Amino acid sequence: DGQIGQAAYSASKGGIVGMTLPIARELARYGNRVMTIAPGIFWTPLLAELPQEALDSLGSQVPFPSRLGQPDEFALLVESIIANPMLNGETIRLDGAIRMAPK
Protein backbone atom coordinates (compact mmCIF):
# COMPACT_ATOMS: atom_id res chain seq x y z
CA ASP A 1 0.00 0.00 0.00
CA GLY A 2 1.15 3.50 -0.57
CA GLN A 3 -0.04 6.79 -1.87
CA ILE A 4 1.61 8.94 -4.50
CA GLY A 5 4.39 10.97 -2.90
CA GLN A 6 4.68 8.67 0.11
CA ALA A 7 7.28 6.15 -1.05
CA ALA A 8 9.52 6.69 1.98
CA TYR A 9 6.60 6.33 4.40
CA SER A 10 5.43 3.16 2.64
CA ALA A 11 8.96 1.74 2.66
CA SER A 12 9.32 2.37 6.39
CA LYS A 13 6.05 0.52 7.05
CA GLY A 14 7.27 -2.35 4.87
CA GLY A 15 10.51 -2.46 6.83
CA ILE A 16 8.64 -2.91 10.10
CA VAL A 17 6.53 -5.70 8.62
CA GLY A 18 9.61 -7.35 7.11
CA MET A 19 11.59 -7.43 10.34
CA THR A 20 8.77 -8.67 12.58
CA LEU A 21 9.30 -12.40 11.92
CA PRO A 22 13.13 -12.40 12.04
CA ILE A 23 13.12 -10.45 15.31
CA ALA A 24 10.49 -12.80 16.75
CA ARG A 25 12.72 -15.76 15.89
CA GLU A 26 15.78 -14.04 17.35
CA LEU A 27 14.07 -13.17 20.64
CA ALA A 28 12.25 -16.50 21.02
CA ARG A 29 15.18 -17.95 22.97
CA TYR A 30 14.47 -15.35 25.66
CA GLY A 31 10.77 -16.11 25.77
CA ASN A 32 9.84 -12.86 24.03
CA ARG A 33 7.22 -12.52 21.34
CA VAL A 34 7.10 -9.85 18.65
CA MET A 35 3.92 -8.68 16.95
CA THR A 36 3.17 -5.75 14.68
CA ILE A 37 -0.18 -3.99 14.53
CA ALA A 38 -0.85 -2.10 11.29
CA PRO A 39 -3.69 0.25 12.15
CA GLY A 40 -5.96 1.97 9.69
CA ILE A 41 -7.50 5.35 10.40
CA PHE A 42 -8.04 5.69 14.14
CA TRP A 43 -9.46 8.54 16.15
CA THR A 44 -6.55 10.41 17.75
CA PRO A 45 -6.11 13.90 19.18
CA LEU A 46 -4.38 14.83 15.91
CA LEU A 47 -7.59 14.11 14.00
CA ALA A 48 -9.52 16.39 16.36
CA GLU A 49 -7.96 19.26 14.41
CA LEU A 50 -9.81 18.23 11.24
CA PRO A 51 -13.25 19.55 10.31
CA GLN A 52 -16.13 17.13 10.86
CA GLU A 53 -16.64 16.90 7.09
CA ALA A 54 -13.09 15.56 6.67
CA LEU A 55 -13.56 13.06 9.51
CA ASP A 56 -16.81 11.83 7.96
CA SER A 57 -15.09 11.46 4.60
CA LEU A 58 -12.24 9.43 6.09
CA GLY A 59 -14.63 7.18 7.98
CA SER A 60 -16.80 6.59 4.92
CA GLN A 61 -13.78 5.15 3.07
CA VAL A 62 -13.53 2.24 5.53
CA PRO A 63 -15.47 -0.73 4.07
CA PHE A 64 -16.69 -2.13 7.41
CA PRO A 65 -17.30 -0.76 9.89
CA SER A 66 -17.59 2.45 7.92
CA ARG A 67 -16.10 4.78 10.52
CA LEU A 68 -12.84 5.69 12.22
CA GLY A 69 -11.30 3.14 14.55
CA GLN A 70 -11.51 3.84 18.27
CA PRO A 71 -8.61 3.61 20.75
CA ASP A 72 -10.42 0.96 22.81
CA GLU A 73 -10.59 -1.27 19.71
CA PHE A 74 -6.82 -0.99 19.33
CA ALA A 75 -6.42 -1.80 23.02
CA LEU A 76 -8.66 -4.85 22.65
CA LEU A 77 -6.34 -6.25 19.98
CA VAL A 78 -3.33 -5.63 22.22
CA GLU A 79 -5.08 -7.54 25.01
CA SER A 80 -5.80 -10.41 22.62
CA ILE A 81 -2.19 -10.56 21.50
CA ILE A 82 -0.99 -10.65 25.09
CA ALA A 83 -3.53 -13.33 26.03
CA ASN A 84 -2.68 -15.69 23.16
CA PRO A 85 0.87 -17.09 23.43
CA MET A 86 0.75 -18.57 19.91
CA LEU A 87 0.64 -15.13 18.33
CA ASN A 88 4.23 -14.39 17.41
CA GLY A 89 6.09 -12.99 14.43
CA GLU A 90 3.00 -11.73 12.66
CA THR A 91 1.52 -8.46 11.44
CA ILE A 92 -2.17 -7.87 12.05
CA ARG A 93 -3.95 -5.23 10.01
CA LEU A 94 -6.55 -3.47 12.13
CA ASP A 95 -8.12 -1.32 9.47
CA GLY A 96 -11.67 -2.33 8.56
CA ALA A 97 -10.31 -3.51 5.16
CA ILE A 98 -9.43 0.03 4.01
CA ARG A 99 -6.76 0.54 1.39
CA MET A 100 -5.97 4.15 0.67
CA ALA A 101 -6.40 5.34 -2.91
CA PRO A 102 -3.20 6.28 -4.77
CA LYS A 103 -3.96 9.96 -4.19
PLM feature spans:
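Conserved catalytic loop/helix region of short-chain dehydrogenase/reductase
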Residues: I4-A8, G31
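Catalytic tyrosine of NAD(P)H-dependent dehydrogenase/reductases that use a Tyr as the general acid/base
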Residues: Y9, V17
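Active-site helix of classical SDR
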Residues: S12, T20
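Alpha-helical segment proximal to the catalytic Tyr-Lys
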Residues: R25-R29
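Rossmann-like NAD(H)/NADP(H) cofactor-binding core
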Residues: Y30, M35, E90
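Short, flexible catalytic-loop segment of classical short-chain dehydrogenase/reductase
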Residues: A38-E49
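Catalytic Tyr-x(3-8)-Lys segment
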Residues: E53-E73
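C-terminal substrate-recognition "lid" of short-chain dehydrogenase/reductases
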Residues: Q70-L94, R99
